[in-house]
C-alpha cells in the first residue's frame, strides 16, 4: 500500500514505481483517471480499473498503447462487472468450443440474468461525463456509435452491428430479450480481446449481450 499526493506528476510516478499493480476504483475516469494511467505507463507498472466510460478507454488506447507495449505495463480497463464476466466468459466458451468441436463459435450471446446490485455515486457521475462528452465531442460520439471503437487502430470495422436497442424475440432461447445496460461496454471489450489475440474467433465473429424478459 502506498500513499501519495495526487497533485504532482512526481508523486504519482513514485507511487506507481513502488507498486507491482495499481487498482483504481475512483471515477469518473474521464476526470480522474488519465494521470494515473500515464504514471503506470511511464514506470512499466501494471494497471486495472472499473471504468465503463468507452470514450475515455478509447482515448487511453490511442494515447498510451504503444508506450505501454514499450514499457511493459499491462493496462487493463473495465475489470469489474463490466467487463470481466463477459470477456472471460467468452474466452472460456470459445476455448471449450475449439477443444470440443475444433472450431470457435461464430456467435456468442451473453444473457444477463438473475443479478442485482446498486449504482454508486461514482458510476452516476461517470454517466454524466459520458453524456456530456457525447454532446460536445465529435470523437466521443464516433466512439459510441462504432461497435469496434475499442479495437486497435486500423481494426475498427466489422460485421457486428452493435448492441441490441429494442426488445426482441430471441432466436436461440425462444423468449423475449431486452437491451442490456452493460452491452455497449462489454461487447466492445470482447471485440477488442478478439483483435488483440489475433482473431482466433475469426473476423466474422459476433458478440451480443441481452437481458431475458420471459416468454
Residue ranges and their predicted role:
Residues 86-96:
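Active-site-proximal alpha-helical scaffold in enzymes
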Residues 33, 38, 51-73:
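Rossmann-fold NAD(P)-binding glycine/threonine-rich loop
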Residues 54-56, 80-87, 115-116:
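Gly/Ser/Thr-rich loops at beta-strand to alpha-helix junctions
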Residues 3-21, 25-32:
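Conserved Rossmann-fold cofactor-binding substructure of NAD(P)-dependent oxidoreductases
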Residues 70-72, 95-215:
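C-terminal catalytic/substrate-binding lobe primarily of soluble NAD(P)-dependent oxidoreductases
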Residues 46-47, 75:
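Hydrophobic beta-strand scaffold residues
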Residues 28-29, 80-81, 153:
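Short glycine-rich anion-binding loops that position phosphate/pyrophosphate groups of nucleotides
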Amino acid at each position: 500500500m502506498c500513499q501519495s499526493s495526487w497533485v504532482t506528476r512526481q508523486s504519482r510516478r513514485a507511487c506507481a514505481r513502488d507498486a507491482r499493480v495499481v487498482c483504481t476504483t475512483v471515477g469518473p475516469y474521464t476526470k480522474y483517471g488519465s494521470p494515473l494511467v500515464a504514471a503506470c505507463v511511464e514506470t512499466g507498472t501494471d494497471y486495472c480499473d472499473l471504468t465503463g466510460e468507452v470514450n475515455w478507454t478509447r482515448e487511453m488506447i490511442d494515447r498510451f498503447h504503444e508506450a505501454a507495449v514499450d514499457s511493459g505495463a499491462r493496462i487493463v480497463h473495465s475489470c469489474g462487472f463490466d467487463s470481466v464476466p463477459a470477456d472471460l466468459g467468452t474466452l472460456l466458451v470459445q476455448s471449450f468450443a475449439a477443444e470440443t468441436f475444433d472450431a470457435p463459435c461464430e456467435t456468442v450471446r451473453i444473457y444477463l440474468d438473475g443479478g442485482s446490485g446498486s449504482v454508486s455515486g461514482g458510476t452516476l457521475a461517470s454517466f454524466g461525463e459520458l453524456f456530456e462528452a457525447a454532446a460536445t465531442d465529435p470523437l466521443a460520439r464516433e466512439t459510441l456509435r462504432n461497435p469496434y471503437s475499442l479495437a486497435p487502430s486500423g481494426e475498427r470495422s466489422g460485421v457486428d452491428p452493435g448492441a441490441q436497442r429494442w426488445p426482441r424475440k430471441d432466436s436461440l432461447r425462444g423468449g423475449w430479450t431486452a437491451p442490456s445496460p452493460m452491452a455497449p461496454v462489454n461487447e466492445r471489450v470482447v471485440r477488442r480481446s478478439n483483435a488483440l489475440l489475433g482473431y482466433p474467433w475469426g473476423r466474422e465473429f459476433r458478440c451480443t449481450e441481452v437481458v431475458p424478459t420471459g416468454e
